[in-house]
């Protein structure tokens, strides 16, 4: 577990991340939501005090317990399932920042809930996410999140609680006297790589590993982003491609937990941008149901690469925040099925209308599910000039940060 000094450092890093995640600086009396699991209660207290000292307005929200969540999905009728409490839209429409603290007591309690019910609930909440996305695009909102160790997470990762905790401490630089300075250094180094990537005029990327043969088309007016403060930790660099140009095979060698369901060995075959063949060693019925949630659920919303020189994460953590930032021996490549990120648009995201997003191939969905491959791989950029450049190999980008 984390001691008081480490929690204090975590809070400092989260506030650094929140500041970086905002396009505009916070003003006095801006509203910041802190949403947390019960196990993250102490960190939420530390954050509230710091936010008050900054002259901001903290709003605390405790996540439902595993029992509450299970009862909700088992007992709710259709009307209850999609119910949005009065005041919720008003709160979201006025938020200037949000910090999410994850420390789940269970990650499998929804395993027996029909996937169609989970999908219905997820779609009903998309309207709230759309409010925050719009505010984010306008520079009125920023968010960050983190995870704390729990017995449940450690158990499903196959690690002791101490080993699990140490992975978090090292990944977030909480063992450093000045973790914010370390994050700032990584932030600046990542900027150099993003600048190099965004200087290339790319027709498509070709990803090759033992089990991957995938073509990804970045599309027009795209840029690589990442290490923006949104996730602590975050080492990935990514873009939201033109989903229509995706073809070939992607394989996730890393397992995944989603809505209480365990999925392993996912193999996706893409044709004309859509996953037309979906296979999994475990959880195949669940992933097939999730990928039929809406029209965009079986299409790619994100293409991501993590440089092992940045990330200290070397173990499976049974949590997407850490698993999508896996460093290990070979770094990782992952795709997210579902929603895309408008901030990977090269222009002003606030000018992106729904019609313009569709025209440029930005995918839209209530789903966003990251699937991770940690195999040794090569990623080649095929340039519009017909030249080819290997941009990523052996777990790192082909340029020094």
Predicted segments, located by residue:
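Dual-mode signal for accessory low-complexity, basic/Gly-rich regions
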Residues: 275-349
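Short, glycine-/Ser/Thr-/acidic-enriched flexible segments
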Residues: 39-40, 104-106, 150, 212, ...
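A structural signal for short secondary-structure junctions
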Residues: 243-244, 259-261, 269, 294-298, ...
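Extended hydrophobic packing segments that form well-structured cores
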Residues: 354-401
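Active-site bordering "gate/hinge" segments
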Residues: 1-247, 389, 399-401
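Glycine-rich, charged/polar anion/phosphate-binding loops
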Residues: 130, 192-193, 201-203, 234-237, ...
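Histidine-centered active-site/metal-ligand motif
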Residues: 109, 332-334, 362-368
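Long, well-ordered mid-to-C-terminal structural blocks that present hydrophobic/aromatic surfaces
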Residues: 240-295
